[in-house]
Amino acid sequence: IFNLGAPSQLDLFDMKPDAPSEIRGPFKAISTKGDFQLSEILPGHAKVADKFSLVRSCYHTAAAVHDTGHQMMQTGRLFTGGIISPHAGCALEFLKGRRSDLPAHVILPEPMGPTGGNMPHGQEAGFLGKAYDPFVLNADPSQKEFKVPDLLPPKEIGEARLARRRELRQVVDDTVKKFEASEAAKLMDSNFAAAYRLITSEQARDAFDLSKEPLAVRERYGMTRFGQCCLLARRLVE
């Protein structure tokens, strides 16, 4: 879970209780189940602090903009010389491939927007190629009529017509095999196959269907965009 933005760490995880009043925040430090203190505004975290690790020594010396931190956290590298390194999820798909009809790597709910530096954030496949880019939800799972846009064929195209279109495309493919030598054609074929599997897959529809979860579970995660994205992420992992 990559949280884009939050209150100051001085008010959350790194209280600095011994610092002068003009430096430390207005909140008090509280004891936790772990061997460290947290802010009083994180009582829930304090109760389970023995179940997670807190790293306070992570920093970088690159340009003081969000983008550089995003690059290193998501790819392990700072982009230099115009080379865009792949996100860890893209690299994993490149090495391991897909295990099912589901995308191997999904961004919820949408890609990061501009955050000051106007540089890549490290959310795409970079030099591995577009074939390994993540599947982007681009929807809010907390909305009442939540649907995944790319799981739905256009309304005017039913299942039978969709199947006929695929058969016609296969006929054309078989006729013009000489074009398959180009990388662009291979990428198009790969993307088409992945998209077709996705929109015709019961497994994919089921995984993205939050209505399958009991209401009590959904409410426990929080009926917010962030909460329901966490729940959806859990379903995709499972």
Labelled PLM ranges:
Residues 1-238:
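Ligand-binding pockets and gating/stacking loops
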